Amino acid sequence: MQIFVKTLTGKTITVETEPGDTVGQVKQKIADKEGVPVDQQRLIYAGKQLEDAQTLADYNIQKESTLHMVLRLRGGNGLRKGKRRCLSLLQFI
């Protein structure tokens, strides 16, 4: 069955699935098609965040349903540390 995944940019991705596919499998199909890593994807349907181990049937997702994908932002402040190092070096020049 065909489902649609809409991104926050408004792009709609078409994904071929089966009712027994897990959310994790759907995320992998999106990763293969769009290059978005599985661990950065959050899928939402009917206002609920979908869990990787559950199937599409568990959420009553049927053909031509639309899921919404948002990206999980990575934590950390690696960039800020880099800036601090640069500033520290500049102080000695």
Curated annotation (Swiss-Prot):
Matching entries from PROSITE patterns are given as: UBIQUITIN_1 (PS00299), UBIQUITIN_2 (PS50053)
Q: Which InterPro entries match?
A: Ubiquitin-like_dom, Ubiquitin-like_domsf, Ubiquitin_CS, Ubiquitin_dom, Ubiquitin_ubiquitin-like
**Cross-link position, Glycyl lysine isopeptide (Lys-Gly) (interchain with G-Cter in ubiquitin)?**
48
Q: Does the keyword Ubl conjugation apply?
A: yes
**Per UniProt, which keywords does this protein have?**
Host-virus interaction, Isopeptide bond, Late protein, Modulation of host ubiquitin pathway by viral ubl, Modulation of host ubiquitin pathway by virus, Ubl conjugation, Ubl conjugation pathway
Positions of crosslink type Glycyl lysine isopeptide (Gly-Lys) (interchain with K-? in acceptor proteins): 76
Q: Which residues get removed as pro-piece?
A: 77-93
Record bears the keyword Ubl conjugation: yes
What is the name listed in the Swiss-Prot or TrEMBL entry for this protein? Ubiquitin-like protein
Whose protein is this, by species?
Orgyia pseudotsugata multicapsid polyhedrosis virus (OpMNPV)
